[in-house]
């Protein structure tokens, strides 16, 4: 039976025999004494294993197999380490190289690699300290998301990945089809989708919200957590074509309830990471973003300020700062606008509400002024928007009018209108992108490094 390195380091039994499996990170020698660092991914720190060629009968052939990247199983005595920077090491009795790695061609050597280089080998970059730390933080966030909602009476539901609806009304969707397109066709006007697999146009889902609302109208509080897809041709550090979304929907919740839930969830997740991923967070603080932990503590310890979009624009317009896009009423807030508000004005997270309806989704509840909607964005320092949501339109006639106003296909949304025809109620929800949260929590600057195998425009490894 073998043990994980994490278990050995956290519960050491000195002078006991241990067996571990893992991968060789580094190898060095001092005469007849060899030192290899083994890591199995269970923790940031590996453990040093010592080979004494004089005390043990190891063949030269076997020793040559001990190269960086090779997988190994070893048994030895756990002892206190005389070396600095580590408490324990293993004196090897026996070892077996399970999978060899050619040291000349293995791309991960004992040096710091650029993120650009590592993006070219996403299948191997997880073996670095940085991506191991990111993966463990992402895992913990995912677990804590479920924990939070289950503790608070929410039901987890699975919404479709293939859909006939454009949940955002933006039209930036990936089409799903089994039709054979023999020739490049820039127009879909001549295609009869009745011959397609589903008998109609089908797409990869951009959101689970609409289907989630249906279940909220019976279970009261639900959440979805799954992959979503956007065919948005954005080559930025904040956008990906495939990403994971957390989307709660709550019956009987008004906009202020929605904001309170979003704030509470965000603080719960960040607190959990600082408490339970301290080793990885210390590493990320030292090597990725100085001040990372203080940044997260500021979010946890702050009361989120709530301001209207109109007030935000007034603040931006009165500023002497040169923004890339000049702020004025009617445009969506840009990242530099959001960062200015959170970093220089309020110096903490804020919730911006009551956005103009002209650039918001059709399902958002319209305010009495008929110009703005009950939308809300949670903005945090250094990144800007991290959560977006709204109170949903629960009035059938108003929702029908809004759908027609935006020239959306009302027949495709007839089932969605049924939710207003039969037992409608005020309800709210929001979306939190997992990758953007991981990006913020770990301090990495590019969203491509927050997901194992990123999908972005003109980028589809494997």
UniProtKB/Swiss-Prot annotation:
Q: Catalyses which reaction? A: tRNA(Asn) + L-asparagine + ATP = L-asparaginyl-tRNA(Asn) + AMP + diphosphate + H(+)
Per the record, the GO terms for biological process are: asparaginyl-tRNA aminoacylation
Q: Which domain of life is it from?
A: Bacteria
Q: Which SUPFAM superfamilies match?
A: Class II aaRS and biotin synthetases (SSF55681), Nucleic acid-binding proteins (SSF50249)
Keywords from UniProt, A to Z, are: Aminoacyl-tRNA synthetase, ATP-binding, Cytoplasm, Ligase, Nucleotide-binding, Protein biosynthesis
Q: Does the keyword Ligase apply?
A: yes
**Is Cytoplasm included in the keywords of this UniProt record?**
yes
Gene Ontology molecular-function annotations:
asparagine-tRNA ligase activity; ATP binding; nucleic acid binding
Class of enzymatic activity (EC top level): ligase
Query: Mostly located where?
Result: cytoplasm
| Oligomeric and partner information | Homodimer.
Its family remark reads: Belongs to the class-II aminoacyl-tRNA synthetase family.
Q: What is this protein called?
A: Asparagine--tRNA ligase
Question: From which source organism is this entry?
Answer: Borrelia garinii subsp. bavariensis (strain ATCC BAA-2496 / DSM 23469 / PBi)
Source taxonomy: Bacteria, Pseudomonadati, Spirochaetota, Spirochaetia, Spirochaetales
